[in-house]
C-alpha cells in the first residue's frame, strides 16, 4: 500500500475552524499519488476525491476522511492514517499555520477568530 509522504501529500493553504466547534481545525489535503491504490477503490482518480482532516490544535485528535464523487453523489469514507502519516499531517498543518497566519497551530484558533472578527467589522462599515 502507498503511504503518504512529503512528496505525495500537499495541503491547501486555507485552513479554518469548524463553525460548530471553534477548537477544531479543518483542512483539505491533496494526494499526489495513485488514490485508487491508496484507498483500494478500482478506477478512482485524484479528481474524484476530496481528502480532508479535522484536528484539535492541542494535538489530542486527528480525523481523516476522503469524499468520493461517484455517479453524481458523494460517498464519505473514514481513513485511519499510519503514525508516520499522522505526523506528516501535523507538520503540514503547523507549517501552513506559521506561514499563512504567523502563529503556531496551537494558537491558530484564537488568531483565526480575531482575524475573522476584524474582517466582519470591516465588512459592516
Model-inferred region functions:
Residues 6, 86, 90, 94, ...:
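Residue-level detector of alpha-helical secondary structure
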Residues 1-3, 114-125:
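Short intrinsically disordered terminal tails
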Residues 20, 30-96:
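Acidic, low-complexity, intrinsically disordered interaction modules
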